[in-house]
A protein has these predicted regions:
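Helix-coil boundary and interhelical linker segments in multi-pass alpha-helical membrane proteins
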Residues: 41-53, 91-102, 241-244, 344, ...
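Conserved, well-structured core segments that form the ligand-binding/active-site neighborhood
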Residues: 75, 205, 209, 316
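Helix-loop-helix junctions within the multi-pass membrane cores of secondary transporters/permeases
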Residues: 2-39, 60, 80-139, 267-363
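Transmembrane alpha-helix interface/packing and boundary motifs in multi-pass membrane proteins
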Residues: 64-77, 186-192, 250-257, 288-298, ...
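Helix-loop-helix hairpins and the membrane-proximal interhelical loops
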Residues: 1-52, 165-167, 199-282, 423-427
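Residue-level signature of catalytic and energy-coupling elements of molecular machines
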Residues: 22, 42, 126, 195, ...
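Membrane-embedded alpha-helical modules
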Residues: 96-210, 214, 324-432
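Loop-to-helix transition at the N-terminal end of transmembrane alpha-helices
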Residues: 47-66
Length: 432
C-alpha cells in the first residue's frame, strides 16, 4: 500500500508521508465542511430539493477532489463555491425569474468556457485584459454580497421603508443567536482553532436546540434521494442572449477566484513559483474547470478550489493524496443529512458574515494611487451588493473603467479583450 501510494502521488519526491497527507486532508475538510450545511440552505431557496442538494454537494465535492488529486496531484480541496451559489439563487432565479434548471444550464456553459480557456491561451488573454484592481474588486464585491445575505438571514439587518435598511431586533432569539454564532467563529479564528466555522455553526445549532427552537432528528442516516436535481440542467434554455452576462459572471468570478487560490496555495506549498506557467497549475485549472461542468449534473452551482486548502498545506499536505482524503470525507458526510436538515438559517448566518469579511482582505492589494483604476474597482465593490447582482456590479464597474480610459486619452491602453467585454455589457443594458 505504502509503495503504491508513493508511486501514484510521489510522496518521497515531495518530502511528505502518508500520515502527513491524511492529517492535512482531515484539516482541509474540517475548515471547509461548513459548505455541506450552507450550500443546501442557499440553493433550496431557488426551489431545489434541499436533501438532494445536500447529497449533490457532497458528491460534486468528492469527485472534484478525486480529479484534483489523481490528475493534478495537488493538495487542493474543492466544493461548490460561496458567492456564486447566492448569485444563482437570489439573482438569477429569484430576481431575474429564470428556473433553476436554466440557471444550472448557464453554470454548465460557463464551466465549458472555463475548461476551453484552461486548455488554450484564452485564460492568459482574458486575465491580461482585465486590470488587477477590477479582478480584486470582484472578489471583494462578492464578499459584501455574501455578507449582506448573512446579515439578512440572521435578522441582523432588516428592511425599512423609511431608511431602506435598519438594525434588527436583538430581543429576537434568532437574531441574537446569529450574532453569537458570528462571535464564536471570530473568537475561535483569532485563537487559530482549526474548523472554527463549522464549530461555530454546530454550537449555535446546539444552543437553538436547548432553547427549544429546533427539534433533534438524529445525526446519521442513509443519504436522501438525489433524483430531484440529478441531470436536471436545461442547457438549451440557457442558450439565449439574456443569459450571456450571467454566464460571463459565473465564468469571471470562478476564473479569477480559482487562479488566485491555486497560485496562493501552491506557492505556499512550494509547488510552484508565483507565476502562471507551471504544468502543475495548468493541470489543476483543468481539474477545477471540469469540476464546474460535472457539478451541474448533481445540481450544484460552480465547483471551485477552496482557499481553506492552505490549512491543509500548513499541516503538511503536499500531494494529491490530501485531496483524495478530503474527497473521501465528503463521501462519508453524505450520511449526516439529519444533522444538516435541522441547522437553521440563523446558525449559518454567522458563517456567511465571517466568510464575507475574509473575502474583503484582498482589498489591501488594490492600487490606491491610480484613480482611473481605483474608481471602477470601488464601483464593482459597492454595486454588487447594492444591486444584489454580481453581473450588474461587474458590468457597471467595467464600463466605468473603459469610459474613464477613453476620456482620459488612454484608450490605447484598453486591451482587445476589454473592448469585447465592453460591447457585451453595453448590449446588456440597452437591449436585454
Amino acid at each position: 500500500m505504502k509503495q503504491t501510494l508513493d508511486q501514484i502521488f510521489k510522496l518521497q519526491d515531495n518530502h511528505t508521508t502518508i500520515k502527513k497527507e491524511f492529517l492535512a486532508g482531515f484539516t482541509t475538510f474540517i475548515t471547509m465542511a461548513y459548505i455541506i450545511f450552507v450550500n443546501p440552505q442557499i440553493m433550496a431557496l431557488s426551489g431545489m430539493d434541499q436533501g438532494a442538494i445536500f447529497v449533490g454537494t457532497c458528491l460534486a465535492a468528492a469527485i472534484a477532489c478525486f480529479v484534483m488529486g489523481f490528475f493534478a496531484n495537488w493538495p487542493i480541496g474543492l466544493a461548490p463555491g460561496m458567492g456564486l451559489n447566492a448569485f444563482f439563487t437570489y439573482t438569477v432565479v429569484g430576481e431575474m425569474g429564470y428556473s433553476w434548471e436554466v440557471a444550472l444550464g448557464a453554470v454548465f456553459l460557463a464551466g465549458v468556457l472555463f475548461f476551453i480557456m484552461s486548455i488554450t491561451r484564452l485564460r492568459a488573454w482574458m486575465i491580461s485584459s482585465i486590470p488587477l484592481n477590477l479582478r480584486i474588486a470582484m472578489g471583494a464585491g462578492v464578499g459584501l454580497f455574501i455578507g449582506l445575505i448573512g446579515l439578512k438571514n440572521g435578522g441582523i439587518i432588516v428592511g425599512n421603508q423609511a431608511t431602506l435598511l435598519s438594525l434588527g431586533e436583538f430581543s429576537q432569539i434568532e437574531t441574537l443567536l446569529a450574532a453569537i454564532g458570528f462571535l464564536i467563529i471570530s473568537i475561535l479564528s483569532v485563537r487559530k482553532v482549526t474548523g472554527a466555522i463549522i464549530i461555530g455553526i454546530l454550537i449555535t445549532t446546539l444552543i437553538a436546540y436547548f432553547v427549544g427552537l429546533i427539534e433533534f432528528n438524529g445525526i446519521v442516516s442513509y443519504p436522501p434521494e438525489i433524483a430531484p436535481t440529478f441531470m436536471k440542467l436545461d442547457i438549451l434554455g440557457a442558450l439565449n442572449l439574456g443569459m450571456l452576462t450571467i454566464i460571463m459572471s459565473f465564468l469571471f468570478v470562478n476564473l479569477f477566484d480559482t487562479t488566485g487560490t491555486l497560485l496562493g496555495v501552491a506557492t505556499r506549498a512550494n509547488l510552484i513559483s508565483n507565476d502562471e506557467k507551471s504544468d502543475g497549475l495548468n493541470k489543476a485549472l483543468k481539474a477545477d474547470s471540469s469540476a464546474s461542468i460535472f457539478g451541474t449534473f448533481f445540481g450544484c452551482s460552480p465547483v471551485t478550489s477552496y482557499v481553506e486548502s492552505s490549512a491543509g498545506v500548513e499541516a503538511g499536505g503536499r500531494t494529491g493524496l490530501t485531496s483524495i482524503v478530503v474527497g473521501l470525507l465528503f463521501l462519508f458526510a453524505m450520511f449526516l443529512s439529519p444533522l444538516a436538515s435541522i441547522i437553521p438559517p440563523y446558525a449559518t448566518a454567522g458563517a456567511l458574515i465571517y466568510v464575507a469579511i475574509l473575502m474583503l482582505s484582498g482589498m489591501e492589494k488594490l492600487n490606491w494611487s491610480s484613480t482611473a483604476e481605483l474608481l471602477p474597482a470601488l464601483v464593482i465593490i459597492v454595486m454588487i451588493p447594492l444591486t444584489f447582482s454580481i453581473a450588474d456590479g461587474i458590468a457597471l464597474g467595467f464600463l466605468t473603467y473603459v469610459f474613464l480610459k477613453i476620456f482620459n486619452g488612454e484608450f490605447r491602453d484598453i486591451a482587445s479583450g476589454a473592448w469585447f467585454l465592453t460591447l457585451i455589457f453595453i448590449s446588456k443594458f440597452i437591449f436585454l
